[in-house]
């Protein structure tokens, strides 16, 4: 089983990584192409394109300017440890053992507007480039056109390396839209996490994001390799619901949030 999750806007490059092991992103030639184009934008243009404050636009203009593909632990950090935010709060990667990180390296991928697809130990430098950004480029009108079917092809390669065809989608709609389902040689398992609110079960963004991270952790810890085993997910009050689920969409319900 291969999992995909979204990246995060919030980054942590201050806390020292919990491991010195790292790998190099596999698709940096594509990243360099985007960086070359992004360096041509002024902070004001970045602000308009990405809907950022002047301060954040200036920060990211500086990031694009200093981006250097010669990644080391001095100028970059492992992606799974650098991303923060709700999904990564649920995943708690900083407490994974070496053996669990090894398993994650083979079974988890992070979708990225700049890097395309990242493995957990791939080094990355700080950036802001959401997949939904309408950055016109030589390949089309936005980043979905830029990446085309490449991400799907790379996922196919990762699945082939495993001898498996099961892809667990724990990413947001914005990011999983960069995966062309028609190009995937895989069975996709989608997930939904709903909380009880005002008498109805609803997807509440903050909780759903955290739950995606918790399920990622569950798969890594238990080495889950089938949809049937995924149904045993029982963390912080979520329970599998057969009535709302289908064979390819697993729905988990929770009656009250637990800390």
Curated annotation (Swiss-Prot):
Coiled coil regions in record: none
The cellular component terms of Gene Ontology attached to this UniProt record, alphabetical and capped at eight, are:
cytosol
The source's domain of life comes to Bacteria
GO terms under biological process: response to hydroperoxide
Matching InterPro entries: YaaA
**One Pfam family cited in the UniProt record for this chain:** H2O2_YaaD
Matches recorded under PANTHER family: PEROXIDE STRESS RESISTANCE PROTEIN YAAA, PEROXIDE STRESS RESPONSE PROTEIN YAAA
Identify its protein family.
Belongs to the UPF0246 family.
Q: What is this protein called?
A: UPF0246 protein PSPTO_1244
Taxonomic placement:
Bacteria, Pseudomonadati, Pseudomonadota, Gammaproteobacteria, Pseudomonadales
